[in-house]
Amino acid sequence: LYPSAISKAFGYSTNYQNETNLVNGYGYWLKFADAEEISLIGELCDSQTVNVTTGWNLIGSISSPLDVNLIESNPHGLNTSQFYGYDNGYKIVDAIEPGRGYWVKVSQAGQLILSSQSLVMSKSAIKIVPTNDLPPKPPDVN
């Protein structure tokens, strides 16, 4: 998938799993020897509905930045943790950036709705509840 990656792509569903087919909306863990810029080819994705399960989920992004407070859910008002990105360790983020994956813990199964059309918080917006829990450790790819 990514010739310069030094690991396979890992998805997450209660544990890490090797993935050979990447699906829009979901996040994946890949390891590279050095920082690099990757070009993605395809159609722009301005909205995405992501199925999530109770507990930690690794989600993807859309083609434009999105403030996490504008993410909607089904059921409405789904409780989530803060969103975490990874940069030599987990960091709480305020926005979902294109081409990156993010961790979020949810209180129940449902759907997260990421849309560039979301301009104001709606009654279906998620409810972010701060937690001290951190996402799962990265997969062992040594």
Feature locations, PLM:
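N-terminal exported-region signature
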Residues: 1-142
